[in-house]
Amino acid sequence: MMDSPKKLGYHMPAEYEPHHGTLMIWPTRPGSWPFQGKDAKRAFTQIIETIAEGERVYLLVEQAYLSEAQSYLGDKVVYLDIPTNDAWARDTGPTILVNDKGKKLAVDWAFNAWGGTYDGLYQDYEEDDQVASRFAEALERPVYDAKPFVLEGGAIHSDGQGTILVTESCLLSPGRNPNLTKEEIENTLLESLGAEKVIWLPYGIYQDETNEHVDNVAAFVGPAEVVLAWTDDENDPQYAMSKADLELLEQETDAKGCHFTIHKLPIPAVRQVVTEEDLPGYIYEEGEEERYAGERLAASYVNFYIANKAVLVPQFEDVNDQVALDILSKCFPDRKVVGIPARDILLGGGNIHCITQQIPE
């Protein structure tokens, strides 16, 4: 049995630290990406091209879709023929740690499609569960096998200085690690991520089908500095959820004992929902979660991705689009803050952060 990454001197850097590259997966699942994913593929392409200006992009695409992906992207990416069940690189890719000598270690968590038999979103996730180890192998990186501990990359944020941010709603959900206590889960995170402290936010974003991943509700933008999804509408269920998170963050400190500067990032003013026009585009397999008209989607500007040269921020043709860009521009003065039309990614169930996974320098 290998020593824990913490004992070996590894830690998880912050996303805003320098990247070697970014991992993404070409979107092809008919039950996630309506109408053959045409609009999603355009959105993915814009994201990939923006990230590629400052770092390498590795794209997992199966042979059957290679020529299609190449028609969109040409030689802008490194193509890898690794099979997947869907395109959520954040959740299926490895969490890559570094040590002070610059060596890397890829953590391979168990993946069960956000809840397994309890409330998972699809039944066959065998390929997804292998993505982390296969990608690490392609990069010739050593792997720390954290299985059978179930975790998705979207469920954790790191400040690179010993603090991990999570939500109770996700990590304590019955579909993840029901046989472990909160204390055992926390200890596994600290040992596997080389961290000193876990901060447990109560909630994520209302109706987020990942059981409320942290990456949709809060994110580190610097040491002791976070953004938090917010609404002033007291009738929106999100209000009480964000308020509980804010109250916790206001009384917490990071691993170094510093209090947080908290920036409130509004959610879109208009609720994002699945429409009647969207529905015919989805083709589901047996046992797969199905969309319905009027279903509220978990839209949040917090689901941005910090690349080397840019911060990619979801846009929803909403009055708060520009507000979010302005707030994040102040948080990231040294990066270009780029708005990306993102409804077509949201229709798949996530957003820009969910389809990207950083590979630290």
From Swiss-Prot:
EC primary class: hydrolase
Organism: Streptococcus pneumoniae (strain Hungary19A-6)
Record flagged with keyword Hydrolase: yes
Gene3D superfamilies reported for this sequence: L-arginine/glycine Amidinotransferase, Chain A (3.75.10.10)
EC numbers for this chain: 3.5.3.12
Pfam families noted in UniProt: PAD_porph
InterPro entries in UniProt: Agmatine_deiminase, Peptidyl-Arg-deiminase_porph
Matching NCBIfam families: agmatine_aguA, PRK13551.1
Gene Ontology molecular function: agmatine deiminase activity; protein-arginine deiminase activity
Catalysed reactions, as listed in the record: agmatine + H2O = N-carbamoylputrescine + NH4(+)
Name this polypeptide is given: Putative agmatine deiminase
Active site positions, chain numbering: 354 (amidino-cysteine intermediate)
Family: Belongs to the agmatine deiminase family.
Highest taxon in the source lineage: Bacteria
An example Gene Ontology biological process: putrescine biosynthetic process
Signal sequence coordinates: none
Keyword list, A-Z: Hydrolase
